[in-house]
Amino acid sequence: MSTFPGSPKLLKGGIVLVDPGSGAVRGAIAFQYNPETLSRSFQVQAAGGEGGDRSQALRVKGPAVESYKLDVVVSAADQLEHPSENPTAVEHGILPQLSLLESLVQPSSAQLISNNALADSGALEILPMETPLPLLVWGRSRIAPVRVTDLSITEEAFDPLLHPIQAKVSLGLRVLSVDDLGFSHKGGSLFMAYLQQKEQLAKRIPAASLSVFGLGGLP
């Protein structure tokens, strides 16, 4: 895809995987093409529930549960135009990229083997397997710790050996807050930075005057 001379470089969105303990980067998945749309929703954590307790009407228990939904396209078309420079795409199509995305939603084979060995040895307690912490990166102002809640892959084109060469990937992500991770967890501190960035951006908008609503004051 050509660009106009002098046009600003388009940043890529994607997912960065970090070690939940040390915070060290363990991998990164850059979207080949940025999604055209990004849907977000918020579930308010109201303190009063539906009971009608008047003292709780404006209270919240914690951060709203924020969710993202996005669709990304993965294609080998550009790579297959230059087969000598892209032997992996020629041999496997986009299976490596899809496999990397699938690794976000399941434990590794090494973790499964390790837990099975613990079970065979008679271990009384086997902890659930911990995956790397995914961070949704959408520009410098939005870096959020997330959990993948939904992954759907529609393979749309194949090579003669049935390797997929184009697919649409639908991702559902839930932002992990300090309610999920705690303040001492690396993800908790990343969430606080994400929330504080939003607060700083909100302060850039001046408060509207009541006159714009046709009001001279409140009743």
What residue spans do the PLM features occupy?
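Acidic, Ser/Thr- and Gly-enriched intrinsically disordered low-complexity segments
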Residues: 1-219
